[in-house]
Swiss-Prot record:
NCBIfam families per the UniProt record, alphabetical: rpoC_TIGR
Protein name in UniProt: DNA-directed RNA polymerase subunit beta'
Biological processes, Gene Ontology terms: DNA-templated transcription
Keywords: DNA-directed RNA polymerase, Magnesium, Metal-binding, Nucleotidyltransferase, Transcription, Transferase, Zinc
Gene it is expressed from: rpoC
Organism the protein comes from: Brucella melitensis biotype 1 (strain ATCC 23456 / CCUG 17765 / NCTC 10094 / 16M)
Listed EC numbers: 2.7.7.6
Cofactor remark: Binds 1 Mg(2+) ion per subunit. Binds 2 Zn(2+) ions per subunit.
Subunit structure: The RNAP catalytic core consists of 2 alpha, 1 beta, 1 beta' and 1 omega subunit. When a sigma factor is associated with the core the holoenzyme is formed, which can initiate transcription.
Pfam families given in the database record: RNA_pol_Rpb1_1, RNA_pol_Rpb1_2, RNA_pol_Rpb1_3, RNA_pol_Rpb1_4, RNA_pol_Rpb1_5
Xref: Gene3D superfamilies: 1.10.132.30, 1.10.150.390, 1.10.1790.20, 1.10.40.90, 2.40.40.20, 2.40.50.100, RNA polymerase II, clamp domain, RNA polymerase Rpb1, domain 3
Family: Belongs to the RNA polymerase beta' chain family.
Binding residue positions for Zn(2+) 1: 71, 73, 86, 89
Length: 1400
């Protein structure tokens, strides 16, 4: 009884708890069971009375009352009649809320096909019936008959007959000898009569017998759908609808506007169409109208239902009165404005406000300034409650009045309410988790929110009019999480790379840099100070300045905490900064006794954080911020026109370069170089000139000058200080202001030959200005485009990685990755220490000399270990990685390593996938926004020489060199490398040297650091001879394969190989040069082949026939592409290409086996290359290579597995197939890092590894064994391993598969959760597929749980769910015990109690 009374006042039934959601096709019985009545009329509401029409689309009898507890005619009102059905109007007396839940239905006079199963590719109905979509549509839309039962006639089942053919057949065989139907009835009959088990068995037999790939694919597709129907219990005929469900009226409302018009949901129009046509069809059937009219009406009904479910999927889009397409049920779900993305994944929040932000330098790091007016509005309910509790008001109404009048007691209460109640601040776009942080509000006058300057970097905020939103966490748990996890003081490190993110910037950096400058000959130089008091005294009396060289005593503590002091050579400015350092034995004065550039400040904060903990760091940051602002203000550093110095030597350098370009022009006119070579040389020369001028300018700015009168050092150049300290501006921008603007790029990415010689200070000429607009505009256009692209990339990344959560501590994996330092052009760009820091060692890391263990296996590498590793010069370390982690759902903590944002091992429940996605996506947007800062200034990227990066001894791997006629050593090997070994014989550096490079060192030579090892021409690729002899041409026929091109401007001719395949006569030619001896015999090469050198298109011949050549001489050369500028434009699309695992446009061809290269018979425009394996058990492998592609292998070359046969970017799938997972991982990580490194963005490798892990989750079944899978199925890797283990135990045959690499979009759509996939992309397709298969969503990932409105299974939600599971299990145990001991009544009562407690 009491339960009933409780329910009266709390009508909301406890929300049902569920663990999974299943989707399937609704049967007609199911639709009827949902429905509360049939809708017979198309009317909506009566336009005079505004009451719903009976049996219409808004009927109150079917859907429920319009007002709470009141029937339509008004006979029954109030609660006491709850549940009564009025006998006059037939309306149940209940809550009007049921109009949101109750559905209706329409009985169709003729069956219609469900458009999703018909048109969503691949068509389910088509695949099931094994008919083409066109044929099915012909039957559905009443063009052709289809034979459903051929009987004993010569007709075949599923045969289509036109009207005439049908008539002829009827005449010939008689009407009852066979059955042929038309329209959806026909398809319904066919589907209903399918015997799925038998079809599945037949298909399996066919599959085993067929040999053709195409047939196999087709059969497999069909088998899959048949199996789906069998497993899910769906019936095929349910794809044809006889009853259409009608959604509740409050979900498709009709709202009266003023002026007697109505705003209606499009669905009402679509339903109205269906009802009208259905009723007309019923009437026509009753009237026994002619067949053709009925058919037409049936077709129109089919079209109306199609439009209702998915408008525009077939035929014309149905538009409303204003020519706007009507929004169908599918459109309600799809896209950014659809149900999933608009309302389920993102919602508008109560208790929030937004305002402009201004800087609040006097705030502490954990505070923000909240305008009083805003706080009053946001915290209203809390204020009402407190007013009531304090007795200022007795009702809510009174409290409201008090607040509206803004009485003084209200302000006091607001202070109380706000104290220790954190609020969340968010700045859009929220690109990573630091875009929302919690602060404690302090009340301020005014209307703008005050933000602490140090958190600006995290929010990417500036104060030029940015706005931020404030949200109030209401529940105690929410406040707790905000305080413990989201407080700005808890987010000191950047989750992407573990570097501090609370770093002073701009003014603060400038102030601190100014403080730390040392100047010569300042007053008081050489004085010694005992403590800060003395120093302050001296400063105030101007005995010393901030920059004087002095000796000072710095006080700190030793390891036991006893005060100690030490004397340093320093300056008063640095002493003031040192005063702020926390007193700790590990924080020496040295870290601030240096020039405080932004980098050094960041290092200092990091150091303090590592050794003194979070609290000290926060206090320290606040104090150096105050100090920085104060001194930036006092220093008065400003930017003046004359601070930009134009170097005197500029004119000279420009004149020299102009002379050079004239010379190149002349060489080109004389025919010594080609147009392309000239262009490259000119661009190169101007590039060098720009660099030279920049160097001179920087030298002038850096120069220290002394005042002739006082003898004191003049103040440093202000602009140089700004740039050098890292506060603002780069060398690049200074070059454009004071040096020369340099080369510009066209919008296409090509560099314009004529540079901009002027700088902005001198001003540009008209022509220069025009050229400069190219680059500038491209920058702006790029920015707009790429912001969108980058956001989309982030979205795809988040989607693919959202269910990577730390779910256990250790998975016990015994495999991992090998880390090595990354070397680029001889420079170490990422040291091994940086790469292994915060990762778990897989094997013990041993010292190479002493052999002692530096890090045990399974321990995380810390900063102190990194120092030892770097000193020891270890070159490769095996570590655990998320990529090789063997956890079933998610990743384990050991494989992941350190949580970068906390600096400690990662916690269970951390959503590492989302963090990885944000870390990769966030700089994407930054990068895109950064292009235009360079204003499109070109940066040429081509090096033409190699310098030693270490001292040591040279060793040549795969040595193959000759001396050419000039006496230089020339590289003849294709895969030769120069190694530099240190004194202990360890490899310090490995450099690949390209074919045709000139070597300046040989095996065993010693080199100094910076010494040139080799050089080459970056713009052409030479073809050289290995043997001495006489040149003879083969198939070099003038006009066919070779043309004498006279340069237009010079008239000088050169001979170029042209595309010989373009004419029929030239199709069999193989242009080549042969080297013969005096007797005319072809010479042999060292590898045994003939000395024949095949030439590709565009090769320029460097020798005449009959010429005498020596080994190493160039006989032809191939011009390379002109240098394109590197810009993130190549970057973002490149990152997307890698993550989407697309095959690059002209991708490299990789050798699959070790062996020898042989040339096979050529095709018309392909060249056949055969690799004969070294191992006789393997078959030779053939490759077809487009002719005319620059191709560098010769017949007889030895090639190793994984080497490139044709250069280019390799396709990631090939790397996976040939070299395996680890090689793929390191390729992807390095390529993606390369793009970000170019922009100076640091991202930890582990983030990329997490994403790659998600891309590699599936294997493609090759041998199905007894697994029940079909070859070609994509199955979860770990799932297959588990099934195989079980099969082996049972003594059955396990299945096998190859790992497949899926792009991130594909991987997201293949997640086991259909809810997550549907909310990502291609909603209709995903839902159709899921419904046919009767898929179950177990709600494992984050997205599905957000959509169904539960706590996500990560972080605190993971714990809560775990506790809930344990509690339920225990309750069940207790109840079972009780059941055994006492009667069932008591146990049931207990159950009821428990459910109620849970609900509350």
């Amino acid at each position: 009884m009491n339960q009933e009374v409780m329910n009266l006042f709390n009508p909301q039934a406890p929300a049902q708890t569920f663990d999974s959601i299943r989707i399937s096709i609704a049967s007609p019985e199911k639709i009827l069971s949902w429905s509360y009545g049939e809708i017979k009329k198309p009317e909506t509401i009566n336009y005079r009375t505004f009451k719903p029409e009976r049996d219409g689309l808004f009927c109150a009898r079917i859907f429920g009352p319009i007002k709470d507890y009141e029937c339509l005619c008004g006979k029954y009102k109030r609660m006491k009649y709850k549940g009564i059905i009025c006998e006059k109007c037939g309306v149940e007396v209940t809550l009007s809320r049921v109009r949101r839940e109750r559905m209706g239905h329409i009985e169709l006079a003729a069956p219609v096909a469900h458009i999703w199963f018909l048109k969503s590719l691949p068509s389910r109905i088509g695949t099931l019936l094994d008919m083409t979509l066109k044929d099915i549509e012909r039957v559905l839309y009443f063009e052709n008959y289809i034979v459903t039962e051929p009987g004993l006639t010569s007709l075949k089942e599923h045969q289509l007959l036109s009207e005439e053919e049908y008539m002829i057949a009827v005449d010939e065989f008689g009407e009852d000898q066979f059955t042929a139907l038309i329209g959806a009835e026909a398809i319904y009959e066919l589907l209903a009569s399918m015997e799925l088990e038998k079809i599945a068995a037949d298909l399996r037999v066919d599959l085993a017998e067929t040999t053709s790939d195409l047939k196999q694919k087709k059969l497999m597709k069909r088998l899959k759908i048949v199996e789906n129907f069998l497993e899910s219990g769906n019936r095929p005929e349910w794809m044809i609808m006889k009853i259409v469900p009608v959604i509740p009226p409050d979900l498709r409302p009709l709202v009266p506007l003023d002026g007697g018009r109505f705003a209606t949901s499009d669905l009402n129009d679509l339903y109205r169409r269906v009802i009208n046509r259905n009723n007309r069809l019923k009437r026509l059937i009753e009237l026994r109208a002619p067949g053709i009219i009925i058919r037409n009406e049936k077709r129109m009904l089919q079209e109306a239902v199609d439009a209702l479910f998915d408008n525009g999927r077939r035929g014309r889009v149905i538009t409303g009165a204003n020519k706007r397409p009507l929004k169908s049920l599918s459109d309600m779900l799809k896209g950014k404005q659809g149900r999933f993305r608009q309302n389920l994944l993102g919602k508008r929040v109560d208790y929030s406000g937004r305002s402009v932000i201004v800087t609040g330098p006097e705030l502490k790091l954990h505070q923000c300034g909240l305008p009083k007016k805003m706080a009053l509005e946001l915290f209203k309910p809390f204020i009402y409650a407190r007013l009531d509790a304090k007795g200022y008001s007795s009702t809510v109404k009174q409290a409201k009045k008090l607040v509206e009048k803004e009485r003084p007691e209200v302000w006091d209460i607001l202070d109380e309410v706000i104290r220790e109640h954190p609020v969340l601040l968010n700045r859009a776009p929220t690109l990573h988790r630091l875009g929302i942080q919690a602060f404690e509000p302090t009340l301020i006058e005014g209307k703008a929110i005050q933000l602490h300057p140090l958190v600006c970097t995290a929010f990417n905020a500036d104060f030029d009019g940015d706005q931020m939103a404030v949200h109030v966490p209401l529940s105690l748990e929410a406040q707790l999480e905000a305080r413990v996890l989201m407080m700005s003081t808890n987010n000191i490190l950047h989750p992407a790379n573990g570097a501090p993110i609370i770093v002073p910037s701009q003014d603060m950096v400038l102030g601190l840099y100014y403080l730390s400058i040392v100047a010569e000959k300042e007053p008081g130089e050489g004085m010694i100070f005992a403590d800060m008091g003395e120093l302050q005294h001296a400063l105030e009396n101007k005995v010393v300045t901030l920059h004087t060289k002095i000796k000072g005593r710095f006080k700190t503590v030793d390891a036991e905490g006893n005060p100690v002091s030490k004397i340093y050579d320093t300056t008063p400015g640095r002493m003031i900064m040192g005063e702020l350092l926390p007193k700790n034995v590990n924080v020496p004065f040295d870290i601030c006794n240096q020039e405080m550039t932004k980098k050094n400040i960041s290092k200092m904060i990091d150091h303090v954080y590592r050794h003194c903990g979070q609290k000290e760091t926060v206090i320290f940051c606040d104090r150096i911020m105050q100090l920085g602002f104060a001194h930036a203000c006092r220093a008065g550093i400003s930017f003046g026109k004359d601070d930009m110095v134009i170097p005197e030597s500029k004119a000279k350098i420009v004149a020299e370069t102009e002379a050079l370009t004239t010379e190149y022009e002349q060489q080109y006119n004389d025919g010594l170089i080609t147009q392309g070579e000239k262009y490259n040389k000119v661009v190169d020369a101007w590039g060098k000139a720009t660099d030279k001028i920049t160097e001179e300018m920087m030298a002038r700015l850096k120069a220290v000058e002394f005042d002739p009168v006082t003898g004191r050092q003049k103040q440093m150049n202000s602009v140089y200080m700004m740039s050098h300290s890292g506060a603002r501006g780069s060398v690049n921008q200074m070059r454009q202001l004071g040096g020369m603007r340099g080369l510009m790029a066209k919008p296409s990415g090509e560099i314009i030959e004529t540079p901009i010689i002027s700088n902005f200070k001198e001003g540009l000429t008209v022509n220069e200005y025009f050229n400069s607009t190219h680059g500038a505009r491209k920058g702006l256009a790029d920015t707009a485009l790429k912001t969108a692209n980058s956001g989309y990339l982030t979205r795809r990344l988040v989607d693919v990685a959202q269910d990577a959560i730390i779910s256990e501590v250790d998975c016990g994996a015994e495999i991992g990755l090998t880390m090595q330092p990354i070397v680029d052009a001889g420079q170490i760009v990422a040291s091994i220490g940086q790469r292994v820091l915060g990762r778990t060692a897989l094997d013990p890391i041993l010292h190479p000399v002493t052999g002692e263990v530096i890090v045990e296996a399974g321990r995380m590498v810390e900063e102190k270990d990194v120092e030892i590793i770097e000193k020891a010069g270890i070159q490769s370390i095996r570590i655990r990685s998320a990529l090789t982690c063997e956890t079933r759902n998610g990743v384990c903590a050991k494989c992941y390593g350190r949580d970068l944002a906390r600096g400690t091992p990662v916690n269970q429940g951390e959503a590492v996938g989302v963090i990885a996605a944000q870390s990769i996506g966030e700089p994407g947007t930054q990068l895109t926004m950064r292009t235009f800062h360079l204003g499109g200034t070109a940066q040429v990227v081509d090096s033409s020489y190699l310098e030693a990066s270490y001292e040591g001894t040279v060793k040549l791997r795969n040595r193959n060199v000759v001396r050419n006629s000039d006496g230089n050593l020339v590289v003849m090997g294709r895969n030769m490398a120069v190694l530099i070994l240190d004194a202990t014989g360890k490899e310090r550096a490995v450099h690949r040297v390209t074919y045709g490079s000139r070597l300046f060192v040989d095996e065993g030579d010693t080199v100094k650091r910076g010494q040139r090892i080799a050089e080459w021409d970056p713009y052409t690729r030479p073809i050289m001879t290995e043997v001495e002899g006489y040149v003879e041409f083969e198939d070099l026929v003038d006009g066919l394969s070779v043309s004498e091109t006279a340069d237009e401007s010079t008239g000088i001719t050169k001979r170029v190989v042209i595309d010989w395949r373009s004419t029929p006569r030239g199709s069999d030619l193989k242009p080549a040069m042969v080297i013969k001896d005096k007797a005319g015999k072809i010479l042999k090469l060292s590898k045994g082949g003939d000395a024949r050198f095949l030439l590709s298109v565009e090769s320029i011949l460097s020798v005449e026939p009959g010429a005498h050549v020596k080994a190493g001489d160039v006989i032809a050369r191939l011009p390379m592409e002109s240098a394109k500028t590197k810009d993130i434009t190549g970057g973002l699309p490149r990152v997307a290409e890698l993550f989407e695992a697309r095959r690059p446009k002209d991708h490299a061809i990789i050798a699959e086996i070790d062996g020898t290269v042989r040339f096979g018979r050529d095709y018309k425009n392909k060249r056949r290359i055969i690799i004969e394996p070294n191992d006789d058990t393997i078959e030779p492998v053939e490759y077809l290579i487009p002719k005319g592609k620059p191709f560098h292998l010769q017949d007889g070359d030895v090639i190793e597995k994984g080497e490139y046969i044709l250069d280019g970017n390799p396709a990631p799938h090939d790397i996976l197939a040939i070299k395996g997972v680890e090689a793929l991982a390191s390729y992807l990580v390095n390529e993606i890092q390369e793009v970000y490194r170019l922009q100076g963005v640091l991202i930890n490798d582990k983030h990329i590894e997490v994403i790659v892990r998600q891309m590699l989750q599936k294997v493609e079944i090759t041998e199905s064994g007894d697994t029940g899978y079909i070859p070609g199925d994509h199955v979860d890797r770990i799932e297959l391993e588990e099934i195989n283990e079980r099969l082996i135990e049972e003594g059955k045959k396990p299945g096998s598969g190859n790992p497949v690499l899926l792009g991130i979009t594909k991987a997201s759509l293949q997640t086991p959760s259909f809810i997550s996939a549907a909310s990502f992309q291609e909603t209709t397709r995903v839902l159709t597929e899921a419904a046919v298969a009767g898929k179950m969503d177990t709600l494992q990932g984050l997205k599905e749980n957000v959509i169904v409105g539960r706590l996500i299974p990560a972080g605190t939600g993971g714990m809560t769910n775990q506790i809930r599971r344990i509690a339920t299990a225990r309750d069940e145990l207790i109840i079972d015990e009780r059941r055994k001991t006492s009667g069932s009544a008591e146990a049931n009562a207990m159950l009821v109690d428990m459910t109620n407690n849970a609900a509350e």
